[in-house]
Amino acid sequence: MLQRTLAKSISVTGVGLHSGERVALTLHPAPENSGISFRRTDLDGEMGEQIKLTPYLINDTRLSSTIVTDKGVRVGTIEHIMSALSAYGIDNALIELNAPEIPIMDGSSLPFIYLLQDAGVVDQKAQKRFLKILKPVEIKEAGKWVRFTPYDGFKVTLTIEFDHPAFNRSSPTFEIDFAGKSYIDEIARARTFGFMHEVEMMRAHNLGLGGNLNNAIVIDDTDVLNPEGLRYPDEFVRHKILDAIGDLYIVGHPIVGAFEGYKSGHAINNALLRAVLADETAYDRVEFADSDDLPDAFHELNIRNCG
């Protein structure tokens, strides 16, 4: 299977979830083996240089997965666009933006899916590399845990826990094996969510200024405030899976393995990536030149060429 990039550059504007400011974002094709990179067009000199994404650049995970370079350049809320790039198997792209955070759009990854569909996807000459999990790796902290286990495909199982009536109406656990299920159908539409009391607290600290009922599920003491309700009965846990897929794709390769988590979040997801990369016996970088050897979970990438 070959690496892929965008067929053409494409732009979109939106609002930053935390700044509330307008953000102009452009995705560009990139050369093979270059990976996913970001560039802040509003910064000059060294501050405006291209940033090659790695798990070691995620240095702020308080509210999202945020790049913070050693020069202090920030690119926040990257998990939704990374999740969409993962769904289309984009190995190489340059993402330019004129603000410190990716626009929140509607709170899901679906607008970025549409953006990729409009841009089109093209195969490149180099072979795609996958990160194959060879042995179990687990991180536990403060009542939360995440783990990778070997698996011939890509499967995600997550459980959330919130003592709240809105969450008690659906299962707290969702499992998706991408050998038989579609990311676009099952995951992409799930929106980020937050509690009204948290929104008020964040705004008191000049955060969450761009959040509203058009780009997030907002919950009061008893119920969902969005008049249209939920897009899936279990939209909350599905969004956590959307986030996790984006967080994991920061490693730069599709993962051949199973990911499980209980009360997972950006910090512990990133810690798991770092733990895997720190143990050379835990993973291998593999290629599938023969499509017959490709795990079923990735066959959809072979036919999803929207160019």
Swiss-Prot record:
Its EC number is 3.5.1.108. The active site is at 266 (proton donor). It catalyses: a UDP-3-O-[(3R)-3-hydroxyacyl]-N-acetyl-alpha-D-glucosamine + H2O = a UDP-3-O-[(3R)-3-hydroxyacyl]-alpha-D-glucosamine + acetate. Keywords: Hydrolase, Lipid A biosynthesis, Lipid biosynthesis, Lipid metabolism, Metal-binding, Zinc. Zn(2+) binds at residues 80, 239, 243. The keyword Lipid metabolism applies. GO terms for cellular component: membrane. One of its GO terms (biological process) is lipid A biosynthetic process. Pathway: Glycolipid biosynthesis; lipid IV(A) biosynthesis; lipid IV(A) from (3R)-3-hydroxytetradecanoyl-[acyl-carrier-protein] and UDP-N-acetyl-alpha-D-glucosamine: step 2/6. InterPro entries: Ribosomal_Su5_D2-typ_SF, UDP-acyl_GlcNac_deAcase, UDP-acyl_GlcNac_deAcase_C, UDP-acyl_N-AcGlcN_deAcase_N. The keyword Hydrolase applies. SUPFAM superfamilies: Ribosomal protein S5 domain 2-like. It comes from the Bacteria. Its cofactor is Zn(2+). GO terms for molecular function: metal ion binding; UDP-3-O-acyl-N-acetylglucosamine deacetylase activity. It holds the Pfam family LpxC. Belongs to the LpxC family. NCBIfam families: lpxC. Catalyzes the hydrolysis of UDP-3-O-myristoyl-N-acetylglucosamine to form UDP-3-O-myristoylglucosamine and acetate, the committed step in lipid A biosynthesis. This is UDP-3-O-acyl-N-acetylglucosamine deacetylase. It comes from Neisseria meningitidis serogroup C / serotype 2a (strain ATCC 700532 / DSM 15464 / FAM18).
